[in-house]
Amino acid sequence: MRAILLGSTGLVGSSALKILNECKEIDSIFTVSRRAPKVEGSKIDSVIEKDSDVWGDIIRKQKDNDVFISAFGTTKKLAGGNEGFLKIDYGINYDAAKAAKDAGVKTFVLVSSGAASSSSPFFYLKTKGKLEDDIVALKFPRTIIIRPGVLLGEREASHGFFESSLVKVASLVKNSVFAFPLYPAYDEEVAKAAIFTALEPLKSTEPEVVIVSGTEVNKTAKEYDAKYSGST
């Protein structure tokens, strides 16, 4: 199986690249990013391009890929507000999805957010939900949406006091009865859930939409370990 990965330098994307590189089911991984990924390997072909406006053209030229995984995203703080967040989180992802469809990708995997909804009163979740809806409307043979809860892991940049505090609380209650409704998950668990679901065979000749909710991420990650652990 051949894969394209967007967001290979981020928290979930870095883990996804490492796992894809170690998985014997994956023959090649293509990435495009503003800076070089930390993970290297003989199966990885990385293009460094600081101008994200041309990423779609680069992706469109990558033929014969089976899976596209987007773990690309930002926060309103890092994007400088709502307008920047919309341009980056929605705009770049949607352009990449259209390019992937043009390139003949069969399965598109989007790492989204828990409670994402285009009808949400909250801008962040509303934007995530609109992106989900518009990617589903592209009608890939299969669209997979991963909706993790609070994301745990070592971030390179601070995402603000509220989010940092939420992450600390979530890390303390993970694997306890108090985890609800945060559904915390580590970056590698989210990555494994995305990859496991992408590796499953298509079940229909009609466009298929698969949602992996926050309650299912950890379970699906364990399924990856059970089936593919040591798959190098």
Swiss-Prot record:
Listed InterPro entries: Him1/Fmp52 (IPR014843), NAD(P)-bd_dom_sf (IPR036291)
Gene3D superfamilies: NAD(P)-binding Rossmann-like Domain
Localization terms from the record: Mitochondrion outer membrane
The keyword Lipoprotein belongs to this UniProt entry's keyword annotation: no
Pfam families: HIM1
Topology versus the membrane: Peripheral membrane protein
Name this protein carries in UniProt: Protein FMP52, mitochondrial
SS bond partners: none
GO biological process: import into nucleus
Alphabetical UniProt keywords: Membrane, Mitochondrion, Mitochondrion outer membrane, Transit peptide
UniProt entry tagged with the keyword Nucleotide-binding: no
SUPFAM superfamilies: NAD(P)-binding Rossmann-fold domains
GO cellular component: mitochondrial outer membrane
The family this protein is said to belong to: Belongs to the FMP52 family.
